[in-house]
């Protein structure tokens, strides 16, 4: 609908092949390959948008819809003690820190009336079997609530959408 309404849409993904296929399906959308869990790649994305290196984008952004996620090893997905600390850190980098970094960088480009939409997970609500993925989505939920309060005086809305089970 955003494209149909004449908006510029930028789709960002870490898998170039999937990104290319999605770009073909959504004619008119710009695409950019980036692993949101890697700081240097998100810095490149922000630079490309701010400096007009992506057609239709420049020094203002009307909204953000952030839906980054990595999932745990299937063998330990419900555990909070079996995964290695590095696996938890990688999950936090993609599922929480990437959102934080992108919002921080794009916030100055958002005008009053803009909206930030964060895609969470029911694992951020459930108290059982969420494993380290649940830890990351609980953290994202907390961040979304705090961000909403901080952005209110700026006239920027923040929504956390918690869909049922999906694959991103």
Model-derived features with residue positions:
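Rossmann-fold scaffold of SDR-type NAD(P)-dependent oxidoreductases
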Residues: 59-69, 95, 118, 159
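Conserved SDR Rossmann-fold cofactor-binding beta-strand/turn motif
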Residues: 157-167
């Amino acid at each position: 609908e955003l494209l149909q309404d004449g908006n510029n849409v930028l789709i960002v993904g870490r898998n170039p092949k999937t990104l290319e296929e999605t770009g073909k399906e959504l004619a008119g959308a710009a695409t950019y390959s980036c692993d949101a869990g890697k700081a240097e790649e998100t810095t490149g994305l922000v630079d490309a948008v701010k400096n007009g290196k992506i057609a239709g984008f420049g020094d203002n952004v009307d909204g953000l819809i952030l839906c980054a996620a990595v999932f745990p090893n299937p063998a330990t997905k419900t555990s909070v003690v079996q995964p290695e600390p590095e696996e938890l850190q990688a999950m936090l980098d993609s599922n929480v820190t990437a959102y934080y970094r992108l919002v921080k960088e794009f916030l100055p480009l958002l005008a009053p009336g803009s909206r930030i939409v964060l895609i969470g997970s029911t694992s951020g609500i459930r108290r059982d079997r969420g494993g380290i993925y649940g830890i990351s989505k609980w953290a994202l939920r907390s961040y979304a609530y705090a961000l909403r309060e901080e952005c209110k005086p700026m006239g920027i809305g923040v929504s956390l959408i918690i869909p049922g089970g999906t694959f991103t």
